[in-house]
Amino acid sequence: MSPQTETKAGVGFKAGVKEYKLTYYTPDYEPHDHDILAAFRVTPQPGGPPEEAGAAVAAESSTGTWTPVWTDGLTWFDRYKGRSYHIDAVPGGENPFIAYVAYPLDLFEEGSVANMFSSIVGNVFGFKALRALRLEDLRIPPAYTKTFQGPPHGIQVERDKLNKYGRPLLGCTIKPKLGLSAKNYGRAVYECLRGGLDFTKDDENVNSQPFMRWRDRFLFCAEALFKAQSETVEIKGHYSNATAGTCEEMIKRAVFADELGVPIVMHDYLTGGFTANTSLAHYCRDNGLLLHIHRAMHAVIDRQKNHGIHFRVLAKALRLSGGDHIHSGTVVGKLEGERDITLGFVDLLRDDFVEKDRSRGIYFTQPWVSLPGVIPVASGGIHVWHMPALTEIFGDDSVLQFGGGTLGTPWGNAPGAVANRVALEACVQARNEGRDLAREGNEIIRQAAKWSPELAAACEVWKEIEFEYEAVDTL
């Protein structure tokens, strides 16, 4: 043994492998107000003790590696390490458990979702000692929240810009999502906005393809928007998708939209990436553009119950990164979404302060301090018969978005938009009169259809359409 090795060994270094729990499992630790807290659903390999598995997660997502290293002695280890401080059993689960981990705030770069996720959901998710790992929730402390701009504008500013109050907003995704020319696409936008919708939308995979380049689409959609505005005397918007192959190209598209004078642009925040999304959110605030966020790719990450990242975490990350709208599921439509869980992360998007509530999947009390709220967007397989339930579930601060439920009506696009607007106005009026939308919803729609032939036609088409499948992701 060399003299240097003997000296280092004498002050505590010992090469080899030791159990993570000896360093990273600290059940007596009281989390600090400034710590970032994480709740992980951990499925260890057979025979693996929960304390060791939870400590391994804390180690591999903070300062640890598989063996002690010399340079551990050159840092203030207790200050920077993550700590597995509590373990909960999962009700009804044979093997998984919830491990709570506290991370010191100094581990994270200010204002960077990318850096936060590189640590907390980095290599640890491929760790062989774990069969599966899922990040269920994060507590973002105010000290870290205040380093982010957050949404470009927020709910109240959007309502003021649009001059629309007291009801949910209505939208429509233009279909077919791929294949239309820019001029025909703009025609569909005009017909939907003229029929009474507040917004139309590019689908998530509409970027700049050979059949419709982005600049042509932006121009025809802006023309349609302004024509519909002049005829309805209502402020309208179209979510022009600025998502691109590079950040520079994305910003160029947003600049062009701003020069056209349109009120809103769109971004696919998961496929585009958090760094690009935050850059676009900053541009939108500086230039008065609203920012609609699509969550394309989310189900790859969040749908499996035991592995991945729950959408409530992705929703919190979006509120930090920036967006004025985000798709949130519908509860009643064609896409995955259990009611209590969905309402839990809808509150996390909109409210200033959300209390811990395990019945809705909220593991931590979350204060948002001054960060603006985000409007949830209900979209996917919904139609006029769903309007009472959607109005009751999501309330006024929401966007209810009907693609096929507008463009698939028998009389055409504009009558489809009329049907949705009439159904919404009827539900809002009934709610304001004290009627129970959950119990009387179908009757409310039938009564409104008596004086709206457009709604009557839509009701006839969709009367037997339901998506009755159990949610995969449950509490």
Swiss-Prot record:
Chain positions of site Transition state stabilizer: K334
Enzyme class, UniProt record, top EC level: lyase
Stored CDD domains: RuBisCO_large_I (cd08212)
Superkingdom, natural source: Eukaryota
Residues the record lists as N6-carboxylysine modifications: K201
Further facts: The basic functional RuBisCO is composed of a large chain homodimer in a 'head-to-tail' conformation. In form I RuBisCO this homodimer is arranged in a barrel-like tetramer with the small subunits forming a tetrameric 'cap' on each end of the 'barrel'.
Key words, A-Z: Acetylation, Calvin cycle, Carbon dioxide fixation, Chloroplast, Disulfide bond, Lyase, Magnesium, Metal-binding, Methylation, Monooxygenase, Oxidoreductase, Photorespiration, Photosynthesis, Plastid
PTM note: The disulfide bond which can form in the large chain dimeric partners within the hexadecamer appears to be associated with oxidative stress and protein turnover.
Single GO cellular component term: chloroplast
This protein's name: Ribulose bisphosphate carboxylase large chain
Active-site residue list: K175 (proton acceptor), H294 (proton acceptor)
Co-factor remark: Binds 1 Mg(2+) ion per subunit.
NCBIfam families cross-referenced by the UniProt entry: PRK04208.1
Name of encoding gene: rbcL
Requisite cofactors: Mg(2+)
Location relative to the cell: Plastid, Chloroplast
PTM-bearing positions, type N-acetylproline: P3
Subunit annotation: Heterohexadecamer of 8 large chains and 8 small chains; disulfide-linked. The disulfide link is formed within the large subunit homodimers.
Modification N6,N6,N6-trimethyllysine, positions: K14
Primary role: RuBisCO catalyzes two reactions: the carboxylation of D-ribulose 1,5-bisphosphate, the primary event in carbon dioxide fixation, as well as the oxidative fragmentation of the pentose substrate in the photorespiration process. Both reactions occur simultaneously and in competition at the same active site.
Lineage summary: Eukaryota, Viridiplantae, Streptophyta, Embryophyta, Tracheophyta
Pro-peptide positions on chain: 1-2
Residues that bind substrate: N123, T173, K177, R295, H327, S379
Major localisation: plastid
EC number(s) recorded for this UniProt protein: 4.1.1.39
Positions with a binding annotation for Mg(2+): K201, D203, E204
